[in-house]
Amino acid sequence: MPEDYEKYRMGSSNESHQKLVQPISSSISKSNKKTKHQTDFVQDSDIIEASSINDEFGEVKRDLKARHVSMIAIGGTIGTGLFISTGSLLHTTGPVMSLISFLFVTTICFSVTQSLGEMATYIPISGSFAQFVTRWVSKSCGAANGWLYWFSWAVTFGLELSVVGQVIQFWTDAVPLAAWISIFFVILTIFNFFPVKFYGEVEFWIASIKIIAVFGWIIYAFIMVCGAGKTGPVGFRYWRNGYAWGDGILVNNNGKYVAAFVSGLINSIFTFQGTELVAVTAGEASPRALRSAIRKVMFRILVFYVLCMLFMGLLVPYNDPKLTQDGGFTRNSPFLIAMENSGTKVLPHIFNAVIVTTIISAGNSNIYSGSRILYGLAQAGVAPKFFLRTNKGGVPFFAVAFTAAFGALGYLACSSQGNKAFTWLLNITATAGLISWGFISVSHIRFMKTLQRRGISRDTLPFKAFFMPFSAYYGMVVCFIVVLIQGFTVFWDFNASDFFTAYISVILFVVLWVGFHFFFYGFGKDSFKMSNILVPLDECDIDSGVRDINDAEFDIPPPKNAWDKFWANVA
């Protein structure tokens, strides 16, 4: 074990902590030559001392509490995907295949979050896993992956804005859709310029509403299944007589259900996207809070996703015409359809208010996540350095503004092809997110190999992931396979529009990867050196940014009352 690392582990040197916050290892770009066209980026030679960057640009602040971190993770996931896009999934695949799809994605999500937890608690830096790919895979791959992941959250913000007005139109269409989009566009953008502690506090209370609403709906659904509704006991009524599997795809082919399952995966993945958000907060939260949040991911997934999908499939038949009728996205929400079918007249309006709150919260998280990813990319030297600038509250304001600008995509909903635009944006964000998930697993594999090369036991880490390294390989392989096959239906009746909708994120990633590679290394011999294509294990930086999780500054105050204890266990 290296001497500096041993000093860090023992907490014997305060000076070592100053060294360990350097944003990136100089080893990643030993062979880089600073050319004229690279001067707008932070180069490794420019960031030898983190303090010099902080003096010039400022830095983010660790003002997020444990409860904030957990709620941000929940706030970014319980949103449009769960409440709205699950209707399309249920209609396409039927209740059983929808549930299987959710369980399958749960295994991927568990693998990815475990990998991320082990890395982010050890090196808690902003936009963490975007920097991990840069450090342990390659600088160009890290740049491409980071920018694609940022792009997915920027586009998702536009998607949330495109939906929020249509959800409000469940009550009235007196106000134009563009007006609602503009109102929330401005409010959410301005709010993200406030210090992160305000963001964390608001997100905590909004996410609390989500949790209470989802728990309440699950209890309501159970009661309706048992017979409290106007239709009497429902039980597994909609799973019998062929209802369980839906119509599938390829009606005249024995593989129609497999095809439906693969086709529905993209909706499932979009619903789960955001469970990794807890690691994005790493630079502004206690590593102990991260560890606690990661450990509860499986509980959240099983309750908020799998149970909800189970009850939706029990209460709403896959061929219910309301799942596909026109009249706004909320009309297609299985949550509201279940209430309407059960004869509960008031609850749909109450729950629609929850959905509005949920989408606003998700949009808020989109800007936060995207801006911190962009900040992390600038730290890693793969984004313009002005994205490092922070205001007095520690908010990277240029990164916030640039991310929020993509909310303008929400105005696509005002066109006659609003539903098509929603599907287009959903596919882009889900596929981009899945690519990022795959590279989280790749980074973790490289991280574990580097630890092994140095003789460092994973038992000494603040958080040790389960089922490793097999789980990381599983996550990597499955993510990349799904990315490649998720759009297979476009090849049956090929047209360019559907092809690009399905694979634009893949194309963008490859273009970014190749483009950044030649940008950093030029077109000479350096660009073809194996050490520039894949960082050698001996040069992988696992020292910069390491923090001692036992430091007093990371202490988490114990719950003061029953209310605090409840949230400590749930969130």
Swiss-Prot record:
Source domain of life: Eukaryota
Pfam families per UniProt: AA_permease
Gene3D superfamilies: Amino acid/polyamine transporter I
Keyword S-adenosyl-L-methionine belongs to the record: no
Record membrane topology: Multi-pass membrane protein
Subcellular location: Membrane
KW rRNA-binding (keyword) present: no
InterPro entries, A to Z: AA-permease/SLC12A_dom (IPR004841), Amino_acid_permease_CS (IPR004840), APC_YAT (IPR050524)
Keyword set, alphabetical order: Amino-acid transport, Membrane, Transmembrane, Transmembrane helix, Transport
Membrane-spanning residues: 69-89, 93-113, 148-168, 174-194, 204-224, 260-280, 297-317, 343-363, 393-413, 422-442, 465-485, 504-524
UniProt region (Disordered), positions on chain: 1-36
GO cellular component: membrane
GO molecular function: amino acid transmembrane transporter activity
Stated family: Belongs to the amino acid-polyamine-organocation (APC) superfamily. YAT (TC 2.A.3.10) family.
Described purpose of this protein according to its UniProt entry: High-affinity permease for arginine and lysine.
Name of protein: Lysine/arginine permease
Species this chain originates from: Candida albicans (strain WO-1)
Gene field: CAN1
